[in-house]
């Protein structure tokens, strides 16, 4: 488990330049460049895809009289939802899928009263078509926006703020990424280093996809009165 400063020092060795002493020393242009490149690297890896390290689960329960639920109020480290991982669990723990845009438009025009709960994701919010019953449990998976660990407390953070911060991502990937970015920033040829990084990135990301969570949002009937992707709930009297 290497800190961001240790990784940058290894990059400096590979680039045959002076090692940085303090990434947050604003009086050292060399150190400032390493910090800028490290931040760019971590931000880029966050945006690349749904890493297992960033995948988290969460839930909330509906409240009487409330139709909209901002996601960042449920999970402060929210970056984006994972596709096909939002489900409704009723009091009998039945699992069903979220409403599609086509279903939403149809229901807005031709809605008939019934025992159905339907919602969509809009502007970072869960928006229900009709006011849902109280205490309906919505579960979902999302990508966290955290990029580093605090070395002392192991707390996840979404900002690189200390020399001792530890990247959440694979340290070898981070080193390769910082290396080619540093070379590019300094006007040097970086094609070989960039290609090596891309190969390792795809290899690592592909391995993580092989162990990702199983999606339960299949099509078809999964239980009597519960239709996957049609968001139908039949409550027992």
Positions of PLM-derived features:
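Glycine-enriched, solvent-exposed interface loops adjoining structured elements
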Residues: 1-237
């Amino acid at each position: 488990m290497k800190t961001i400063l240790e990784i940058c020092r290894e990059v400096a060795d590979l680039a045959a330049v002076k090692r940085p002493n303090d990434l947050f020393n604003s009086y050292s242009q060399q150190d400032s460049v390493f910090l800028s490149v490290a931040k760019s690297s971590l931000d880029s890896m966050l945006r690349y895809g749904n890493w297992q390290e960033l995948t988290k689960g969460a839930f909330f329960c509906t409240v009487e009289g409330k139709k909209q639920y901002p996601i960042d109020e449920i999970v402060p480290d929210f970056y984006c939802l994972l596709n096909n991982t939002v489900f409704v669990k009723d009091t009998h723990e039945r699992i069903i899928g979220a409403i599609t845009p086509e279903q939403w438009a149809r229901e807005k025009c031709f809605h008939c009263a019934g025992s159905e709960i339907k919602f969509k994701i809009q502007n970072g919010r869960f928006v229900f078509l009709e006011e849902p019953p109280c205490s309906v449990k919505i579960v979902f998976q999302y990508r966290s926006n955290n990029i580093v660990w605090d070395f002392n407390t192991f707390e996840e953070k979404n900002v690189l703020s200390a020399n001792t911060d530890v990247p959440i991502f694979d340290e070898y990937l981070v080193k390769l990424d910082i290396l080619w970015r540093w070379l590019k920033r300094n006007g040097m040829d970086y094609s070989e280093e960039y290609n090596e990084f891309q190969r390792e990135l795809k290899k690592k990301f592909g391995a993580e996809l092989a162990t990702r969570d199983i999606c339960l949002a299949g099509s078809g009937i999964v239980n009597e009165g519960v239709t996957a992707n049609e968001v139908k709930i039949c409550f027992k009297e």
